[in-house]
Curated annotation (Swiss-Prot):
Gene of this entry: vps25
Protein name per the record: Vacuolar protein-sorting-associated protein 25
Function: Component of the ESCRT-II complex (endosomal sorting complex required for transport II), which is required for multivesicular body (MVB) formation and sorting of endosomal cargo proteins into MVBs. The MVB pathway mediates delivery of transmembrane proteins into the lumen of the lysosome for degradation. The ESCRT-II complex is probably involved in the recruitment of the ESCRT-III complex.
GO cellular component assignments: ESCRT II complex
GO molecular function, one term: protein homodimerization activity
Species of the source: Xenopus laevis (African clawed frog)
Entry-linked InterPro entries: ESCRT-II_cplx_Vps25-sub, ESCRT-II_cplx_Vps25-sub_N, WH-like_DNA-bd_sf, WH_DNA-bd_sf
């Protein structure tokens, strides 16, 4: 199933940030929702600023409109303020997009563990995000950095413990 673009995406003024404060806030909210929905649909976690600016997300070739780099940065800053984005490098060119925050991913993973009677079991990180048992689960294919943050959130709640097994990491659920 393809991504369903919101109506604003085909409205040329959407690609120019508006000067009116109220209008701009609504526009940034719409852009934030669009970015999170698009990343969720396409299972995107780690992204590059230049690549995303050229992607269909900010570049509608059908109406020949593209959000400027400066405006893309404003949208990304809005997402950062809401806790949905974190810069990976100092020059703000790569970022982690969090359409689910780590604690939310932790809950999803823990529900799967509980539902399948796997508490008191040890998993490698690979098994959780790439194993046959998790095929079809929403967290299958999750970025490893995001998985670790999710498991750290569960560790804070005493529901899991991250362990090192030889050269790889694993997790035990309680």
């Amino acid at each position: 199933m393809g991504f369903e673009w919101p109506w604003q995406y085909n409205f040329p003024p959407f690609f120019t940030l508006q000067p009116n404060v109220d209008t701009r806030q609504k526009q940034l909210s719409a852009w934030s929702s669009l970015v999170l929905s698009y990343c969720r649909q396409n299972k995107l976690y780690t992204m590059n600023l230049m690549e995303i600016q050229e992607s269909p997300l900010f570049n509608n070739k059908k109406i020949q409109r593209k959000l400027s780099l400066e405006s893309v940065q404003v949208v990304l800053e809005e997402l950062r303020k809401k806790g949905n984005l974190e810069w990976i490098d100092k020059n703000k060119s790569r970022f982690l997009i969090m359409w689910r925050r780590p604690d939310e991913w932790g809950k999803v993973i823990y529900q799967w563990v509980s539902k399948n009677g796997m508490t008191n079991s040890v998993f490698t990180l690979y098994e959780l995000i790439s194993g046959d048992d998790t095929e079809g689960e929403e967290f299958h294919g999750l970025d490893e950095a995001m998985l670790l943050r999710s498991l750290e959130a569960l560790q804070q709640e005493h529901k899991a413990e991250i362990i090192t097994l030889n050269e790889s990491r694993g997790v035990k659920f309680f």
